[in-house]
Amino acid sequence: MIQSGEYYGKDDYYSRTLTKEDFWYGHGLLSPLGEDIPNPYQDISTPLTHADYEQKRASMRKEFSPDSKKLAIDLTFSPPKSVSIAMLDPILKYQLIEAHNQAVKNVLTYVESNYIIWRKHTNKGNKTEHIKTQNALFACLQHRVSREQDPQLHTHCLLFRKTMVDGKIMTIEDRFIHSNQYLLSLMYDNELSKALQERRIPLRESNSLDQKNKHFEIDGINDTLIDHFSKRKIQIQQYQDTYGLSDSWEGSHAAGLASRKAKSTEKLQDLEKMWLQDISELGGFVVEKRPEKTNSTRLLEIDTIVKNSINLLQEKSFAFSKADLMIEVYKEGMMMGITLPEFEKSFDAHLQVDLIKAGFRTLNNEVYYTTPKNIARAKYIDTILLQERIENYATLSAENAIDKIDTISSELKANYGWELSKGQKEAVTKMLSTSDKYVAIEGIAGSGKTTMLEQAKNLYQEQGVKIIGMAFTGKAAEAMETEAAIPSQTIHRYLNQLSPSTPHDTWDFSAVKKADTPEVWIVDESSMLTDHLLSNILKASEQRNAKVVFLGDPNQLLPIGTGNAFARMTLEGAEQVPTVRMREINRQEEGSN
């Protein structure tokens, strides 16, 4: 359970000069959820007092079972460090708090409209439905100090895990909120950027330490001041490095939760005096407001960002959600500060031209979209894989291949005490004896794919066939080369070699010549291929006239099954290419996969 009392009063609540820093928010205020909260204007936002908060916390606990561990979900929003520093200027202080609160409320409105979901289960037909109730109650508690005693404005938005459904108080299905925290963080950043610029606060672009993520700071607050007051950020980064957490937003978020410690109880006024002294010693700061101006091309610029984001996503996957698109748009448009209404307007326009509904994914309760280009690409893949061919791509007859692989298996048994599994034998036989140009091998982890590839490579080389390995990741390519002795590299690197004069990911294979001797390409990690990458492998292999063996793990499919080419080509009962399924776990040699 979130001990909300621990979040309250840490910044010396009773010494604050502002009277409306903390507030209730949400349509729950206008329902039985908020009937015991003073709300004289019957609004979806009203001031929060300590007494009312404690009373609501106690009454809300009664709505949960005694063993319930979680009363509320904490959504915390914090501006860039320069905002917290600039707040020490009394002229800017109230405007910055106002901009922060505006951004917070806009995000909470989106959360309430989209992610307050009740799970309805119907025994008849055993069906589950996720219903958006659009009714939430947030307790928003504003703090000013980081855990390392640095200035850091932030608001804990405690979402009570109850909502109203048909006049009854029901429990929220909170996984939709947890899975969209990155989106909500980016949305807050954009809303804040826009709110600050509306108040003529000058912004400058700033990058993360790894130079991967764009961000912004207030112009006039230099990096020396920011670094001086960022002890908590440095602490989180050190925790990530020490424990090997990724340098992504998710890694930073996890490190922040794992490394946090209790705040001290020093008074805010005393801390502010100390901060001002530090600022003075470091040269101070001056924030000069910018003159008011209008941007006549703003909507066009936003539309371009949305279009570019669609293009980016269609190269990553066949289908993507609206939330996926929002993330890309918000990352690119942060300096502009793209608001939700502006995004929605552009999205609706593109929905008529560039986006096609691909289906609904129950797992995250979202509609998925694809593009005309992705539809055409998928059709091309299906056409190439399914077309009948005159040329025979077999290296050995089925009988000859079986004899050879049986002999190899017997020799392994005699020399090492183990033999090839049924799945391994079938895979090698199919690779060498089928007349088809494209073959798929589906193998789970531990099924002995590496051992199988090594034996196939030996038989191919005996027949004078050149075998080329490639994989989605460099690690897998290296493993294929060192463990199966197949010369290998990443797919991107190999395609770049075939089309050296074209930009990355925009290959042109029209000048590629047919191979002088038979070639077989082994494409490992095929279950991770996007349609974009697979279509280019097919184009290159058609020009080169190479046989292609797609090797994939059914347990490592891309997150979205729709449009996943490997899943489509190996669909049981409707295979597009000859497919062997290796499902036996083998313990033939150390490191076998």
Please place each PLM-identified region on the residue numbering:
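Conserved ATP-binding/catalytic motifs of P-loop helicase motor domains
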Residues: M1-N593
